[in-house]
Curated annotation (Swiss-Prot):
Family membership noted in the UniProt record: Belongs to the PTPA-type PPIase family.
Organism name: Bos taurus
Domain of life according to the entry: Eukaryota
Biological processes, Gene Ontology terms: mitotic spindle organization
InterPro entries: Phstyr_phstse_ac, PTPA_C_lid, PTPA_sf
Name of the protein this chain belongs to: Serine/threonine-protein phosphatase 2A activator
Subunit-structure text: Associates with the serine/threonine-protein phosphatase 2A PP2A(D) heterodimeric core enzyme, composed of a 36 kDa catalytic subunit (subunit C) and a 65 kDa constant regulatory subunit (PR65 or subunit A). Interacts with the catalytic subunit PPP2CA (via C-terminus). Interacts with PPP2CB.
EC number assigned by the record: 5.2.1.8
Amino acid sequence: MAEGERQTPSDSSEDAPPTTQNFIIPKKEIHTVPDMGKWKRSQAYADYIGFILTLNEGVKGKKLSFEYKVSEAIEKLVALLNTLDRWIDETPPVDQPSRFGNKAYRTWYAKLDQEAENLVATVVPTNLAAAVPEVAVYLKESVGNSTRIDYGTGHEAAFAAFLCCLCKIGVLRVDDQIAIVFKVFNRYLEVMRKLQKTYRMEPAGSQGVWGLDDFQFLPFIWGSSQLIDHPYLEPRHFVDEKAVNENHKDYMFLECILFITEMKTGPFAEHSNQLWNISAVPSWSKVNQGLIRMYKAECLEKFPVIQHFKFGSLLPIHPVMSSC
């Protein structure tokens, strides 16, 4: 989000002169395992992880019901996500022999593929219209794969990259931090859960019971940050059904736990072993630090995830610029 601090305000941007930056259509750059070194040294990696950690700090100790500023750009992003939600209602699952991967998802995705730039154009001011094709790629990448009808942390990362790009061009600002997580990302999660349930999407690259979650990772990071220094909720409480039911509307982490228990049967320790182990960690700050390390190791440093990440002018593959 620090990138956003250097941007000119977007409030009067409809009258501002067009930007002179050369935007490009993002493309894949990580083709083999040795290419992963390029990614870890890249400006894109530094900006992406910096964005995640800035938001992590911004929501620390705050409930979802915390009062925060909601800018016009935030409202427009929520409206965009509401449109995606409405399209799910308009595209019911079809009857098919296979239980998983309902083919109606491809119809839904084709609509997004066709309309993505128009949707992004409703969020981006006219003087930044040249950025729309580049930014829209990340939106299209963030909702799952239409060939495999699956969804995973790589798609979630594309949505975070989409938001990061909007910060870099100044559409989202430093004072939007809390709303980015609580209003936009939370709405995105709701829509993704609806997609997963409606079309019975497969988890992309799931590690089964040994993974943190079949589909998401970021809400566990930001959700654990929300719970740091909570007066009475400790990590051991998230495996307590009563504590989850009473507090899930205030905390993303607990909402994730509720969704898992709705979708899976059997003892929690068996279907979500990694989370069960985390419940034994003594403090939320330790949980938060551990999840950040795990996210880097299990998502950002894994070739099967990052091979699909796309790089453009806003999240470039070139090495981090050294500041002299």
